[in-house]
Amino acid sequence: MKTKPLPTAPMAWAESAVETTTSPRELAGHAPLRRVLRPPIARRDGPVLLGDRAPRRTASTMWLLGIDPAESSPGTRATRDDTEQAVDKILRGARRAGGLTVPGAPRYHLTRQVTLTDLCQPNAEPAGALLLALRHPTDLPHLARHRAPPGRQTERLAEAWGQLLEASALGSGRAESGCARAGLVSFNFLVAACAAAYDARDAAEAVRAHITTNYGGTRAGARLDRFSECLRAMVHTHVFPHEVMRFFGGLVSWVTQDELASVTAVCSGPQEATHTGHPGRPRSAVTIPACAFVDLDAELCLGGPWGAFLYLVFTYRQCRDQELCCVYVVKSQLPPRGLEAALERLFGRLRITNTIHGAEDMTPPPPNRNVDFPLAVPAASSQSPRCSASQVTNPQFVDRLYRWQPDLRGRPTARTCTYAAFAELGVMPDDSPRCLHRTERFGAVGVPVVILEGVVWRAAGWRACA
């Protein structure tokens, strides 16, 4: 049986490959380029080219790389020129796309802000602590006048913030315009301000003791009390804290001077992807106070080898002279569209309380003023204008109908019944997310914390539950 001899002329190994006369050994110092230029089905040493004969170049490859084969003369020199031109185009495209990166390297984004250390003292916080950005305080009294129900004391919020400014840094903590600066709020400081609202009272008091001790003694304690009063005044005037706070990032590094701090945090991507700059703890895992952490899957008896979502949750109690605000970090396998029903089950008592007492101390409407829709009176009168179903879209007939304009003051609304609000913080993509419960020492104070490993930040917007 005769067999055909192998052809001596070189053959094209792949349509999308760029063939060159340069041997792989000459490209030993250019491994990335060799991976780009060598086709996936080529042998390790590539095709052997005999003599000075140029390889065959496919039109599709040259067209995609922007090379005109007609402009190149045949031969080894023309082939090398085409190869150099192709490599140059590939490298320029890689530089425009952000450079050659290591395959599989995590992508993350850092953010930085200079802030006063009144509500966020990075020297006293662990790497990986959660930070929130606060809206400018001068906006809050204006929001209170627009959102507070009739009869609520809108001046209560302005007075509470004024008292907080008196205990802030740099004397009064006011800028040249006479108002406070916008800044950052540490999650631990927020938890300490809401310590009275947590069920785990001992763990919450430990967080408060940590803030009072490591933030500046009695001055920090006064700020905690006055910030807590600000939160209650915000609930009273329906300027809910979740509407003026947003996720900033996980703490990585900081530089402090006097009462100012330049804070760097991971706002997107893996928290553990960047270096903290501390030899003893080069990587930062997310650290949450144990009293403010809720494993929703364990509470609802859910389980399985899946990843989990992380949510930031605010809860409110709207009861006259008993307003409360509380903040949690919730871990759950439920996606955002299914979390509201789970929160309703978990905080159902707050929902009932707000529905019953949320409309208290509001100015009611005058008696007997369009309380009910007067359907019986127009229906009984033959002189009342009517409109058939086919004429509903015609303004000529619709405008003649009776207009009912009830007075909704003092009636329950979605805002008076709001008991919680949540926003997605990120995910824990591991099949078995690790949540380590331990006691961390902050100076002389031991605080029960939960350390979350493998958190990937991807913050989303707020959703209110009513």
Swiss-Prot record:
Cellular localisation: Virion; Host nucleus
Disulfide-bond pairs as recorded: none
Region of interest called Disordered, as start-end residue ranges on this chain: 1-29
GO cellular component entries: host cell nucleus; viral capsid
Record-annotated membrane-spanning stretches: none
Entry-linked Pfam families: Herpes_VP19C (PF03327)
UniProt keyword tRNA processing, yes or no: no
GO annotation terms (biological process): viral capsid assembly
Main location: virion
Domain of life: Viruses
Protein keywords: Capsid protein, Host nucleus, Virion
A GO term, aspect molecular function: DNA binding
InterPro entries in UniProt: Herpes_1
Functional note: Structural component of the T=16 icosahedral capsid. The capsid is composed of pentamers and hexamers of major capsid protein/MCP, which are linked together by heterotrimers called triplexes. These triplexes are formed by a single molecule of triplex protein 1/TRX1 and two copies of triplex protein 2/TRX2. Additionally, TRX1 is required for efficient transport of TRX2 to the nucleus, which is the site of capsid assembly.
Quaternary structure (record): Interacts with TRX2, MCP and capsid vertex component 2/CVC2.
Family membership: Belongs to the herpesviridae TRX1 protein family.
Official protein name in the record: Triplex capsid protein 1
Species this chain originates from: Human herpesvirus 2 (strain HG52) (HHV-2)
